[in-house]
């Protein structure tokens, strides 16, 4: 597979495994070239229960799209869903470095650094850290704090966590097929980002994705 041209995504569900391949144009913009869906076995409610069946299911979909496009898939992005994926919120703050001249990017990065230091429980991993809001001096909520005047910058982050076991099992299935995982994402988060506009997110719209064993709400 020509790494510079193709982007591959694998979505392993309880009833189907879907492989999508996009090709980058000269300006780096992706365009979908192929989407293949095959029945999946060995998955229950998003959790891999039989590694042999799952490997064979992924292999069937990967080989089908590979034959169609004349490529060999060796790396891919993957999605994951199940009741082992959850959200948790954490609020923290920093004091601004130069209150007279307003909040700067360094202050925001310092706040992000504090959030990066938040640790997940031993049996979970943090998949995403997403700022929900910013609060300047505890009374001024802003979407982008840079330039706002204040001594204290706070934020509440939404943490997307996933149990380690399903991640390890999915990575094992990929390794058995010689596929390197480029990144793993919560399906609900990716679906919401792809389908909802910025205004819809602000207004509280939701996307409901009903699968064979898992229903995601974003």
Kindly give the residue locations of the regions a language model identified.
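Glycine-rich phosphate-binding loop of actin/hexokinase-like ATP-binding domains
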Residues: 203-218
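Nucleotide/phosphate-binding catalytic cleft detector across ATP-hydrolyzing
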Residues: 1-16, 20-207
